[in-house]
Amino acid sequence: MSKSKVTSRTIRQGFTLAALIAGSIAATSGAVAGECPAGKMQPNVRPMVDHKAIGVTDVTLGAINLEKQPASIKDRELRFRKLTIEPGGIVPWHSHDDRPALIFVQQGEIVEYASNCSEPIVHKAGEIRPEVAGTSHWWKNLGKDTVILYVGDVRKDPHDHNM
């Protein structure tokens, strides 16, 4: 799908998916994402690792050029994706310093290894995780079940294929 040709059907599909996610969040009684345990947050406590993506399918469900919208945010794209992470799968190290995101765990349980937390952070189905400036991390599916994440992010470089 061309980023410049977002059809009304695509927009309706996006709204439908957003409504399904919102309903799932409501059904989980407002679950809060896993957080770094008290006293375990420190800047750059976990070094960058060079894992490659393993067992991850990343599908862009829709994208909007924000410069062409009333907000007129130059050089930014709002993107909505579905990540499927198989057991043992790895989402490689990446930064959110220039790409804020919201991650919704639709299915399964996944572990986050964040640069600013000395302990792994567990995320479970029904949780939503904000990722903002200062967040650099990688994720791993340590379970026996497939994990499904829905990701909404605002990226600057449309050629940035970091997860």
What are these regions, as identified by a protein language model?
Residues 124, 133-160:
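Ligand-binding loop in jelly-roll beta-barrel domains
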Residues 2-6, 10-14, 24, 30-79, ...:
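A short, N-terminal "cap"/entry segment at the start of jelly-roll beta-barrel domains
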Residues 91, 109-113, 128:
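Short beta-strand segments in beta-sandwich/barrel cores
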Residues 98-117:
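Glycine- and acidic-residue-biased ligand/ion/polar-headgroup-sensing regions
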Residues 75-80, 97-98, 134, 144:
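Extracytoplasmic
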Residues 85-86, 114-134:
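Short acidic-glycine-tyrosine-enriched beta hairpin
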Residues 72-76, 89-102:
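A short beta-loop-beta micro-motif enriched in histidine and acidic residues
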